[in-house]
From Swiss-Prot:
It comes from Caenorhabditis elegans. The lineage of its organism: Eukaryota, Metazoa, Ecdysozoa, Nematoda, Chromadorea. Expressed in oocytes. Expressed in male germline. Expressed in spermatocytes but undetectable in spermatids (at protein level). Disruption phenotype: RNAi-mediated knockdown causes embryonic lethality where embryos are arrested at the onset of meiotic anaphase I. During the first meiotic cell division, homologous chromosome segregation and formation of polar bodies are impaired, and multiple centrosomes accumulate resulting from a failure to undergo cytokinesis. During meiotic anaphase I, impaired cortical granules exocytosis resulting in the formation of a one-layered eggshell instead of the normal three-layered eggshell. Residues 1147-1262 are annotated as: Disordered. Residues 1151-1162, 1177-1197 have a biased composition (Polar residues). Its EC number is 3.4.22.49. Residues 1243-1262 have a biased composition (Low complexity). It is found in: Cytoplasm; Chromosome; Cytoplasmic granule; Cytoplasm, Cytoskeleton. This is Separin homolog sep-1.
Length: 1262
């Protein structure tokens, strides 16, 4: 096509025409070669996953192999030339742009194809700044309204607020674009004018609701919906002052997920194969067929490129927000899908970007098996950047019928320590997986012509991703971060030229690219965290990098609030580590365990040496730097301000560190205890906000320590909460809460002691599991002998934990009570005599504990408190007299005898699998249970109050529902349990899974819900069902590991089913912490139900009813393996008792459930007699509800005490319980035993199993 224009020099017209043709040829060539590469990738996906193969958590090995083939492809190696050519054409276009603008309108439309196709090229390859430059040039030539909308979105995304203000004044929009303009204006005013934030927040919320309710289905409306949701996701990233204190912000997680969902819908309707929700691998993901028919349509190139880029950025941000908010399962799921989509797009930058994100996340997570994922991703990063990539020859982990050996690693345990731990070798977990030896990292050189060295100087965001890969490869060493810090300025300068072209003003010095800021911030946070974990001091290089990082992440504060807060707090901890160096907190020296065959007690003792005997470090390195008290007080004030202004947002990296740091350094016990509570359950509370789609101060957080104090003081006197928490420096702390006194806070143990505890404990569990699953050719007598040896070692190990891990602080786990007037007066005297050694709350606690502790232990515990501070030496000489006086005044107080008191443990994920309920101090004490979190406890108590229910809860065992062996592979268990179930009027299913609506109805309408099968029943009761249910029934999940919490990393809640039930407001959850044999757990359940519900049916009066915790305690004592079985079963929630019901009746045998054949897979729902109508909980007329104290009402020590077994409910606490990921289920081995049986024989019968394990029987040939 020949173009002439009188107003422009002919030579320039010819150059523009030639450039137009060259750009078209280059972009089409790029699209064709990319399409060839996409076809290769598509064939690899079909080979690895099949046409419709699932993408799940075990897909990383396959994705790593596909990535290595991608990096080795000839088509991939030729992509760099297009980057070089496009860069030259971009420069040429900028020299001719002025002439193109002066052409006639018709000619300008023709020349608009130049920036349009370059815009597509740069969007597709993730070079956003140049893409936006070309987009703005295209708008100047064509005046496309939809392109203007795209430009506004991208300018806001990149943080170019000054340029947005100019464009809003100069651009004219159609009526159809009014909402896009309005959303941008509202967001701009919200960012720049804090006094208008309330008004702008309301306007944005109204616009969001308007867009959501709009039924129009068009590309522009979906783009608007995604954009508005993304804007809303950032609105909570502001400090909450007086004006915003009561505002409801949009929740970040739910809104960024909505933005990603809308962007995915846009891609699915344009290029279906690139949609994250498209799992048909045969669907075309190639871009060329969609461009081939629109080669002359400049508008199409712009919008297809913008749509794909926006989709990638929304998906990436969604994954990062999930990490920030501790949504572990959603994080990994989103990242795996992102890598899959990136590979299908064949975009080098996107593949590297998603691989880096996965590698970064894998380096954070510390659960068993995560080291494999981390290494796979590091290998993939190096392979992508290598000039000579190697095919990853690794296979997917083998599927076996064996029980999953879920371990409980401690946070921060590195791969290098594996040989000194009791975890299985990596090869045991991965089958035939063979990992590559890592290659050396490919350096950038001018002489090299590979893809990496060619693209690095041309693409600033790619350069930042390259530096991130280097940091990941170097395990975030100081050398790699220093290199990144030095290189960042050069990367910024290269990218700044494009940003200046956006403004068309050479005097403008724009801020760094948001993507580069985020990447650098992420790397610095990981590096600082590792420095703190390794106790490294801060040198000059460290402080230089820290200060530079703080400056960089502050360029776009509302987008990087989480990073600003995290980097700031990590810097404070570098400056003031505030380590615990008390006498009982010495780190232990780790030694390799002895590998021994367990044939006798001596063997198990050799394999698991007594806890607490490891040598301890005698001298700790002291910080020689003088302590600046004045500076620290400023730091303390700054932290309080942050807690106050940003307390409404729950960002993991910041919150788990700042609040725990305040908890261990604050001198105010109420502030410290409040901070400890707020440092936990971050992911679960974010999940609650996500479901509610709003974020508000006080919604899932407590607004301050005054509010926390009110909640604690409103607790029943009979209830004590004990939190065992892991601090930011990984030390273990105990926090004790009771309504009558200030919180008690005691550092318990060094991190190395906690590692030793869980290391040895996990080994004992694994050893028992191996005996049960793989007994070999041994007699039944020998089988039980070996298991009893392990059980005996577990018993002594638990004793050792109390003695050496808790020490004298073990008594603090016992419940507290209200002091009488004389005892309270004595506590005040002791507090004053200590001269600062004992706080008043601690003095009250010690007076109360005097009757429960011997004099020596009592004095030792007081001296622990005094060591934490300073005290008068004479005070020690008064301790024997103080103990005698305390015992005397407590003997005058009959509260210990007349009231049953309850201890509820809130345990951090890393120590939650340990059987705390079986500590010797609880041997004669059945009233101990667990709570999911302090927040959930307050929420449960408030729910009881609002529903006018009495504590303990009264349960009608006849009004129950059961699911028995839904997988239909536990035939003997079915026979045993069906016979027992026939005694009751229960409804349920045997050998098949009920429908979701039946499960929801059962949880809502029944008093009790029983699951007897594998794990927690996630296969038949998925999270989606529990999310939509209101659980009024107590839930007994009698599967192995049903309530186990698998820890992941500091600040994460861990994987567990209990959070799903807690989210559904389940009042009580009973389940197993580890694998237990079938016969044993069946007998345990039968004994517990009989003892709590059946055996008490003839009693009258609520005080005479047997509590479930008492029945559980009794069942533990009767278990054949009192620790391996008895200690496995625990309860989360409030106490329950049996409701008075009519005696059991004989039922028509025709209506009883029958055991189905094990091989049958059809529905086995059985007809039952009509169930007892559900009876609502009512307040007993004979025992009135305890009045609730108001905020300003003081409690008198002499007020009337409540009757035994009746807890008073608290005042309203506006908190909600949380949700998190399901723990992986574990198969079990079940023991066959008749329903009514004589004493357990010494020789077991043949056993069925949930896996391939079988207990030896007498019929076996030995």
């Amino acid at each position: 096509m020949k173009i002439t224009n009188k107003s422009v020099d002919k030579q320039h017209i010819e150059k523009l025409d030639e450039l137009r043709k060259n750009v078209s040829c280059t972009v089409i060539g790029f699209a064709e070669q990319t399409a060839e590469l996409q076809q290769e990738i598509s064939e690899l996906f079909i080979a690895e996953f099949g046409v419709n193969g699932p993408i799940d958590m075990n897909s990383l090995s396959k994705l790593a192999r596909i990535t290595s083939y991608y990096a080795s492809s000839e088509y991939f190696q030729g992509l760099a030339k297009y980057q070089r050519t496009a860069c030259k054409m971009f420069i040429t276009w900028q020299t001719l742009r002025k002439e193109a603008m002066e052409c006639r309108s018709k000619d300008r439309e023709i020349f608009a194809s130049i920036p349009a196709k370059l815009c597509f090229f740069y969007f597709y390859n993730g070079e956003l700044c140049r893409a936006v430059v070309c987009l703005l040039d295209y708008i100047d030539l064509s005046d496309d309204t939809l392109a203007k909308e795209a430009a506004l979105r991208w300018l806001m995304f990149l943080g170019e607020t000054e340029l947005i203000e100019k464009k809003l004044k100069t651009w004219k929009m159609d009526k159809s674009s009014k909402d896009m303009f309005s959303a941008t204006e509202f967001a701009m005013n919200y960012l720049k004018k804090s006094e208008y934030r309330v008004e702008m927040l309301e306007k944005l919320m109204k616009l969001r609701d308007k867009v959501k309710s709009d039924p129009t289905r068009s590309f522009s409306r979906y783009e608007l919906a995604s954009y508005v949701s993304w804007l809303c996701s950032t609105l909570s990233n502001v400090p909450v002052g007086s004006a915003l204190r009561e505002c409801e912000f949009p929740d970040r997680v739910s809104h960024i997920q909505e933005a990603a969902l809308k962007s995915d819908s846009l891609v699915r309707n344009r290029i279906p194969g690139l949609a994250s929700s498209q799992f048909d691998n045969s669907v075309n993901a190639s871009i060329w067929p969609f461009l081939d028919g629109h080669q002359e349509d400049s508008n199409y190139y712009v919008h297809i490129g913008s749509t794909i880029a926006w989709h990638f950025e929304m998906r990436r941000e969604c994954a990062l927000v999930n990490v920030t908010t501790a949504q572990t399962r959603d994080s990994m799921s989103a990242m795996i899908l992102n890598l899959r989509v990136a590979l299908k797009s064949a975009s080098f930058f996107r593949v590297l970007q998603t691989t880096n994100t996965l590698a970064y996340y894998s380096s954070i997570i510390e659960e068993a098996g995560s080291e494999k994922n981390a290494k796979l991703m590091r290998v993939s990063c190096v392979n992508l950047l290598s000039s000579n990539p190697i095919i990853v020859r690794c296979s997917t982990p083998k599927e076996t019928g064996a029980t999953s050996r879920a371990h409980t690693p401690m946070a921060g345990s590195s791969v290098s320590e594996k040989q000194n731990t009791m975890r299985p070798d990596l090869a045991d977990l991965l089958g035939d997986l063979e990992l590559l030896d890592e290659q050396s990292f490919h350096p950038i050189t001018r002489s090299c012509v590979c893809n990496v060295c060619t693209i690095y100087p041309l693409h600033s965001s790619f350069a930042a991703e390259y530096m991130m890969s280097y940091a990941i490869h170097s395990d975030f060493s100081q050398l790699s971060i220093k290199h990144f810090n030095d290189e960042f300025a050069r990367i910024r300068e290269r990218g700044m030229s494009s940003q200046v072209l956006m403004h068309r003003d050479s005097s403008v010095r724009p801020r760094p690219n948001i993507i580069q800021n985020e990447i650098f911030g992420m790397c610095v946070i990981r590096w600082l965290t590792k420095k703190l974990d390794s106790k490294e001091s801060a040198d000059e290089d460290t402080m230089e990098i820290f200060n530079n990082a703080l400056k960089i992440v502050r360029y776009l504060q509302q987008r990087t609030t989480d990073m600003i807060l995290a980097v700031t707090q990590l810097g404070r901890q570098l400056e003031f580590p505030m380590e615990c160096n008390y006498s009982w907190m010495r780190p232990t020296i780790r030694k390799p365990r002895v590998k021994a065959t367990i044939d006798c007690a001596v063997d198990i003792l050799r394999a698991v040496s007594p806890f607490g005997r490891r040598p301890k470090v005698e001298k700790l390195e002291k910080n020689l730097q003088p302590f600046d008290k004045e500076r620290f007080e400023k730091v303390r004030l700054a932290m309080r301000n942050e807690m106050n202004h940003y307390g409404h947002i729950l960002y993991r990296e910041w919150r788990c560190r700042l609040f725990a740091y305040v908890g261990r350094t604050s001198r105010d016990p109420w502030e410290a205890a409040y901070a400890w509570a707020e440092s936990t359950q971050i992911g679960a509370r974010n999940a609650v906000q996500s479901r509610l789609e709003k974020c508000k101060r006080g919604l899932v957080t407590m607004s301050g320590h005054d509010r926390f104090k009110t909640c604690v003081q409103s607790m029943p006197d009979e209830m004590t909460l004990v939190q065992i928490a892991m601090a930011d420096d990984k030390t273990i702390y105990l926090v004790k809460l009771h309504a009558d006194r200030d919180p008690i806070i005691m550092p318990l143990a060094h991190y190395s002691q906690a590692v030793e505890l869980m290391d040895k404990f996990t080994f004992l569990l694994d050893e028992d599991e191996m005996i049960a699953k793989y007994p070999g050719d041994i007699t039944p007598e020998e089988f039980w002998k070996r298991r009893k040896i392990v059980d005996g070692r577990m018993m002594t190990f638990v004793d050792e934990v109390q003695k050496h891990f808790l020490g004298v602080a073990a008594s603090l786990l016992m419940p507290s009570g209200q002091l009488g007037p004389k005892a309270a007066e004595l506590a005040i005297k002791i507090h004053k005599l200590s001269k600062g050694g004992l706080l008043l709350g601690e003095a009250k606690e010690m007076v109360y504990q005097s009757k429960l502790m011997d004099a020596k232990s009592w004095e030792a515990l007081i001296l622990r408190f005094c060591e934490m501070r300073t005290t008068d030496e004479k005070f020690k000489s008064f301790l024997p007299l103080m103990h005698r006086n305390s015992v005397e005044v407590m003997n005058q107080d009959d509260s210990i005898v007349t009231e049953k008191k309850y201890t509820y443990l809130v345990i951090c994920p890393h120590l939650s699998q340990f059987c705390w309920e079986r500590l010797p101090i609880f041997d004669e004490y059945p009233y101990v249970g667990r709570q999911v979190s302090i927040h959930s406890t307050f929420s449960q108590l408030e729910a009881m109050k609002s529903q006018e229910k009495q504590i303990p809860l009264q349960i009608d065992v006849q009004n129950a529902y059961y699911i028995l062996d839904p997988d239909n592979n536990l035939g003997e268990t079915q026979k045993r349990m069906v016979e027992y179930i026939n005694k009751f009027n229960w409804e349920g299913t045997v050998g098949s899974a009920p429908k979701s609506n039946e499960i929801s109805a059962a949880l809502s309408q029944r008093d009790a819900f029983f699951f007897i099968g594998h794990g927690s029943g996630s296969s038949v009761m998925p999270r989606s069902v529990l999310k939509q249910s209101t659980c009024n029934a107590i839930s007994l999940l009698m599967g192995c590991g049903s309530v186990r919490t698998i820890p992941q990393a500091l600040g994460f809640d861990g994987k567990t089913a209990i959070l799903d039930y807690a989210m559904a407001k389940c009042p009580l959850i009973v389940g197993c912490l580890w694998t237990v044999t079938d016969g044993e757990i069946d007998r345990f359940l039968i004994r517990m139900i009989d003892d709590c519900f059946e055996d008490s049916k003839s009693l009258t009066g609520i005080d005479k009813l047997r509590q479930l915790s008492e029945a559980m305690h009794e069942a533990r004592s009767k278990a054949r393996l009192k620790y391996l079985t008895g200690a496995a079963v625990v309860m989360y929630g409030l106490p329950v008792v049996a409701k008075q019901t009519t005696p059991f009746v004989e039922k028509d045998q025709r209506n009883l459930p029958q055991t189905p054949k094990t091989s049958a897979r059809t529905s086995m729902r059985m007809e039952t007699v009509p169930k007892t109508p559900k009876q609502e909980f009512v307040t007993s007329k004979s025992v009135p509800m305890t009045p609730i104290f108001s905020n300003n009402e003081n409690k008198s020590p002499s007020r009337a005490r409540m009757p035994s077994r009746v807890l008073k409910t608290p005042r309203q606490v506006k908190t909600f319980q949380e949700e998190d990921d399901e723990a992986p289920k574990r198969s079990t081995t079940r023991q066959l035993k008749p329903l009514v049986a004589p004493p357990i024989p010494a020789t077991p019968t043949t056993r069925t199993t949930r896996s391939s394990a079988r207990t030896p029987s007498r019929s076996r040939n030995l």
